[in-house]
Amino acid sequence: MSQITLIILVLAIGFSCTKSHPINSTRDGEDSGTDLKNLLTEPANTTYATNSTLTRKELNSTIQPERNDEGSAIRKIMASKKDENITGQSEINTSAKSQPINSTRDGEDSGTDLKNLLTEPANTTYATNSTLTRKELNSSIPPERNDEGSAIRKIMASKKDEIITGQSEINTIAKSQPINSTRDGEDSGTDLKNLLTEPANTTYATNSTLTRKELNSSIPPERNDEGSAIRKIMASKKDEIITGQSEINTIAKSQPINSTRDGEDSGTDLKNLLTELANTTYLTNSTLTRKELNSTIQPERNDEGSAIRKIMASKKDENITGQSEINTSAKSQPINSTRDGEDSGTDLKNLLTDPANTTYATNSTLTRKELNSTIQPERNDETSAIRKIMASRKDENVTGQSEFNISTNSNLNTTTHHEDAVVSPTEKVYVPNNASSAELNVSSTIQPKEADVTTSSANDIKKPAFPYCIILITFQIVTVGMIIYLVFRTMRKPCQSERAIPLNSFGFGNNSSYE
C-alpha cells in the first residue's frame, strides 16, 4: 500500500512540472493585455506525440532534464532566465507562438516593448524521427554534447548579444542591432537593449544527403533528422525576417559611419545602421522536396511543386523576392542623394537601402555562383545585362541595358559667332539602344549651361570692348592733318614777300605804282 502511495505522489509531482499558458495571450499575437516584457520563450499549444513503446529512458523532463545514458532522448538545459523553457521529445510537432504586444506581422512599428524579448520563434515545426538516436539529437540553448556522435556544440557567449555558432557547412552572418534602431535605420524609440540574437542574412545551404553531423541548431534549434530541411527562426526584432533555403545568395551590408554606398564621405550619420540587405535573390530548384523547403514567418510553399516564396522585408516599402528567374527593378530613391557618394547636401540619416533602377536579368540555367545581389551589382556571367547605378545628380536618369550609349556634352569653347566662350559640361545624356524607352532632355543638350557657378564665373566670359581704338585713330588722323596744314602754310609766306612793296610817308604801302 505504501508503494502505491509513493508512486501516485511521484506522478503528481511529475505532472506539476509543466508549462502553464501565458495569461491573456492569443495564438495570433493580438494584444490581449498581456505583459510580455520578461517572457523569453513561451511555446503555446505544444503537442507531444510519443510512441507507446518508448521507455522511460526515451522520454525526458522539460525544465531541467538530465539524460546521461545512450537511450537517445534530447538533453535540455534550463537557461539562465527564469522565464525560459526548453522542451524536447522524440516526436514533436510544435507550433510555438509568442507574439509581441501590438506588433504587426509586416514589421511596422506598433509601439511594442521588445526590451526583454530574446527569441520569438513563430510557427516553428519540429519534425524528428523516432529512430534517431541520442547522438543524432542535440540540445538547443546551451547544448552539451560530449559523445562521439558529432553533433555541434553551441556555447552561449558571455555577452548577452553574442551568439557563437559553428557547423560543417553554414555561412552565417550574425546580426546584433544597436539600441533604438530599426531594420530600416529609422529610430522607432524601441529599446532593444536586451535583444540577444538577431541573425541577419543567414545563408543555409544544405543538401538532401547531408546527415545530422552536417546540420546544426542555432538558438532555438531544431532540425534533427537526415531530411535536411532548413530551419527558420524569428529574430527578436519584430520587423526582421530571416530566410534560408537550399540555394541562396545573400549579400550582407554593414555600412560604416558617415559613409556612402561607395565609401566616400557624404556627411551622413549612419552610426546606427548595421546591416543593409538590398536586392537579395533566392534561387531554388523545382526538384526540392518538402524537406528541403521550409516555412518562414509568413511562409509559404511546402510541397515539391517549387513555387516562389516571398518574404516581406522589415521596411514596409521594401520587398525581397526570390525566384528562379527574376527581373526586379527596385526603386527607392534618396532625396537629393548621389549614388556615387558625392555630397549633394542630403541628409541620409535614415536612408538604409536605396536601390535605384536596378535591373536583374538572369537565365534559368545560371547557377548560384553566377548570380549575385550586390548594392552596386555586377555582372558575373556572359549572358546577363549591364546594371547601371544612379548617378550623383538628382535630375539625371540612369538606365541599364546590355548595350549602353553615352553621349556626353563636351567643352566647346566656341560660340556660333566664333567668340571665345566657356561652356561647362554640366549635362550628361544617357541614350539607350531602345529608342522607344529613351526620353532625351533637349534643353540640356542644345542649350547647355554657359555660366555654371561650379565651373566658370562672370569674369571668365569675354565681353565686347569699348571702341577706344577708333577714337584714338581718329584723333591721331586729325592731329597729323593739322600739323601738315600748319607746315604748308608756314612754307607759303616767304613766297608771297618776294616783291618789295614801297612804303609811303605814313608807313603803308603805296598801291599807286600798280595802277
UniProtKB/Swiss-Prot annotation:
This is Mucin-like protein Glc1.8b. The chain crosses the membrane at residues 468-488. Residues 489-515 are cytoplasmic. The keyword Transmembrane applies. Residues 80-114, 314-358, 393-413 are annotated as: Disordered. Keywords: Glycoprotein, Host membrane, Host-virus interaction, Inhibition of host innate immune response by virus, Membrane, Signal, Transmembrane, Transmembrane helix, Viral immunoevasion. Residues 21-467 are extracellular. Belongs to the polydnaviridae Glc1.8 protein family. Involved in suppression of the insect cellular immune response. Inhibits host hemocyte adhesion and phagocytosis. It comes from Microplitis demolitor bracovirus (isolate Webb) (MdBV). The gene is O16.
